[in-house]
């Protein structure tokens, strides 16, 4: 989910600016509803995690991320900005349900004496994901946009195609996260009952 947050926060402005010719300010403002939704769902996710545990919170969150990204990848090339903004809210809602609760669920599996080491590992992997994700997805966007441009697509259309390709790959990663969370959260739920 850390990879999703940082990647989408970089890809979306590139998409809005490259495909629609928007200013950085307008592109940033279009992400604001998703960020606000993320803040709310982070609070909700924390409360649900405290009350019920990881099941069904993590699978639902990853499902929202995956479904939102799949839908964005299918609509981005058609350049329907309202749909992309709405689907971005769905993705960020899923991230809010996953980010902190997944870290809590991971730390809960460790003995108390190991929590500092677990926290250090989580922080390290979060930073790796936050660094790797945008690099990977910007590379995919750029490569795909260049290929589309070389095939004769207009610059704005090529940028939209590149964005759709990058989000499609991110969706595959989210589907893997969903499958993993389904197995993990269900196992944790059965072990606690």
Label for each model-derived stretch:
Residues 189-193:
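Short, charged juxtamembrane terminal tails flanking transmembrane helices
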Residues 1-148, 159-188:
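12-transmembrane solute porter fold
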Residues 151-156:
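Interfacial non-cytosolic loop connecting adjacent transmembrane helices
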């Amino acid at each position: 989910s850390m990879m999703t947050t940082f990647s989408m926060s970089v890809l979306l402005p590139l998409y809005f600016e490259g495909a629609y010719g928007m200013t950085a300010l307008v592109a940033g403002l279009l992400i604001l509803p998703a960020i606000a939704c993320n803040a709310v769902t982070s609070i909700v996710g924390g409360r649900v995690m405290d009350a019920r545990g990881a099941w069904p919170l993590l699978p639902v969150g990853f499902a929202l991320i995956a479904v939102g990204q799949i839908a964005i990848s299918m609509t981005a090339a058609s350049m329907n900005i309202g749909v992309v903004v709405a689907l971005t809210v769905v993705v960020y809602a899923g991230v809010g349900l996953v980010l902190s609760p997944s870290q809590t669920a991971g730390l809960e599996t460790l003995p108390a004496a190991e929590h500092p080491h677990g926290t250090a590992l989580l922080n390290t992997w979060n930073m790796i994901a936050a660094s790797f994700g945008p690099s990977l997805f910007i590379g995919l966007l750029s490569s795909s946009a260049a290929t589309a441009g070389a095939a004769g697509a207009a610059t704005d259309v090529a940028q939209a195609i590149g964005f759709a390709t990058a989000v499609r790959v991110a969706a595959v990663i989210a589907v893997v996260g969903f499958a993993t969370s389904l197995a993990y959260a269900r196992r944790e739920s059965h072990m606690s009952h």
